Amino acid sequence: MYTSKQPFLKSKQPFRKSKQPFRKSKQPFRKFKKPFRKSKQPFRRRPRIGPGDRIDYRNMSLINRFISEQGKILSRRINRLTLKQQRLITLAIKQARILSFLPFRNYENEKQFQAQSISIITGSRPRKNRHIPQLTEKYNSNRNLRNNNRNLSSDC
């Protein structure tokens, strides 16, 4: 029997591992009626640039697909192009702009965009009240005290 005065004695029998695994059942953890299988062919979007399309500043039908309504070059994430394709498209757009095939900005759409944004801003923005508040009695009295103190100090 173990008492508080006696030291703890280790048992002389070695620790034996159980021969049974932790989980007694041999069935898998989750049993689905239909096992989940990944499709063999992954879903792929059709590339925006076909194999026959030439990326060139004269190919306006191709270039117009990669420009926003305001005339800006769309990002690679939006275009879903490879780095090489995006670089070639960007160069072609810049060449077309310089050679005046393309405008630098699409002013028609930009004017509509500005008109909409201005109407939204002016409609919701509160106007600042620019009138000067009248001086209160407390403010006047404090100002008079300061003026009196200045006059007294200048008299000395």
UniProtKB/Swiss-Prot annotation:
Gene3D superfamilies registered for this protein in UniProt: Ribosomal protein S18 (4.10.640.10)
GO cellular component: chloroplast; mitochondrial small ribosomal subunit
Keywords: Chloroplast, Plastid, Ribonucleoprotein, Ribosomal protein, RNA-binding, rRNA-binding
Keyword rRNA-binding belongs to the record: yes
Start and end residues of each stretch annotated as Disordered: 1-54
Compositional bias annotation for Basic residues: 13-48
One MF annotation (Gene Ontology) recorded for this entry: structural constituent of ribosome
GO biological process: translation
Subcellular location: Plastid, Chloroplast
Family: Belongs to the bacterial ribosomal protein bS18 family.
Subunit annotation: Part of the 30S ribosomal subunit.
Protein's recorded name: Small ribosomal subunit protein bS18c
Gene that this polypeptide is encoded by: rps18
